[in-house]
């Protein structure tokens, strides 16, 4: 059984600044980290490995120069995966879901797999699209919002998905893609032994050409900017008479 767990390197949100001149986001001083939601995907894959005994877990990511960071690679591998595959190219800097999914699908197809696990979304965009788009690209079953993995055999996966007023139990044939919610587990903190052992695990670095990806995206992000701040009018209405109430209602109408 070969399980691929996908993750994304995202900027640490506490280090992102806003350029006052044009409202664009400045990532120059922001360190990269594993997207918080993808930690659940990594943990889910490694728990399955422990249950099955003979499974192999491969961590996989698509991105830009952040994936060249040795510390980041060690962080991923210290959490349990046996191997790491990264697809690196400038075109994947701040890639949109369709671009990321196309590259992940091509890389997963080259690597081979039985089950591919994603987080429900990424910490930066949280579009919640990549897992389903990967399934579509590979023409295999895909389920998002998975809150529990009930069973996994050589041919079938059974999971639970919590909806607003019910819990679904779903079974799908392998190979398949699932996107797990944060309810599925609590990611473990790597031990010192695991951190030291991570440096010995294999890492494969691929380019778009290595996975046969030459397509030009149909759309691209032109700019990412913070919304313009509007000054408050600071309208103060004193009193509780009919005129004051009418003025209050009129001001409410203007903003609704």
Curated annotation (Swiss-Prot):
Pathway: Amine and polyamine metabolism; carnitine metabolism. It holds the Pfam family ETF. GO terms for biological process: carnitine metabolic process. Keywords: Electron transport, Transport. GO terms for molecular function: electron transfer activity. Transmembrane segments: none annotated. InterPro entries: ET-Flavoprotein_bsu_CS, ETF_a/b_N, ETF_b, ETF_beta_N, FixA, Rossmann-like_a/b/a_fold. Belongs to the ETF beta-subunit/FixA family. Required for anaerobic carnitine reduction. May bring reductant to CaiA. Heterodimer of FixA and FixB. This is Protein FixA. It comes from Salmonella newport (strain SL254).
């Amino acid at each position: 059984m070969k399980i691929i767990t996908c993750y994304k390197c995202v900027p640490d949100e506490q280090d992102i600044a806003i350029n006052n001149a044009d409202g664009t986001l400045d990532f120059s001083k922001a360190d990269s980290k594993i997207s918080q939601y993808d930690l659940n995907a990594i943990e889910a894959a490694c728990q399955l490995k422990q249950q099955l005994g003979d499974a192999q877990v491969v961590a996989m990511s698509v991105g830009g120069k952040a994936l060249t960071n040795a510390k980041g690679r060690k962080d991923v591998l210290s959490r349990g995966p046996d191997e790491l595959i990264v697809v690196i190219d400038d075109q994947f800097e701040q890639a949109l879901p369709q671009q990321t999914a196309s590259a992940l699908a091509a890389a997963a197809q080259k690597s081979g797999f039985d089950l591919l696990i994603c987080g429900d979304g990424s910490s930066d965009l949280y579009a919640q699209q990549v897992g389903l788009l990967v399934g579509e690209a590979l023409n295999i079953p895909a389920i998002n919002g998975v809150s529990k993995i009930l069973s996994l055999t050589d041919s079938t996966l059974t999971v639970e998905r919590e909806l607003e007023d019910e819990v679904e139990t779903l079974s799908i044939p392998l190979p398949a893609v699932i996107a797990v919610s944060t309810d599925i587990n609590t990611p473990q903190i790597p031990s010192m032994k695991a951190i030291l052992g991570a440096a010995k695990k294999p890492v494969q670095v691929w380019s778009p050409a290595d996975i046969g990806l030459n397509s030009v995206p149909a759309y691209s992000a032109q700019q990412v900017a913070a919304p313009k701040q509007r000054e408050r009018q600071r309208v103060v209405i004193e009193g509780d008479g009919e005129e004051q109430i009418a003025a209050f209602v009129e001001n409410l109408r203007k903003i609704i």
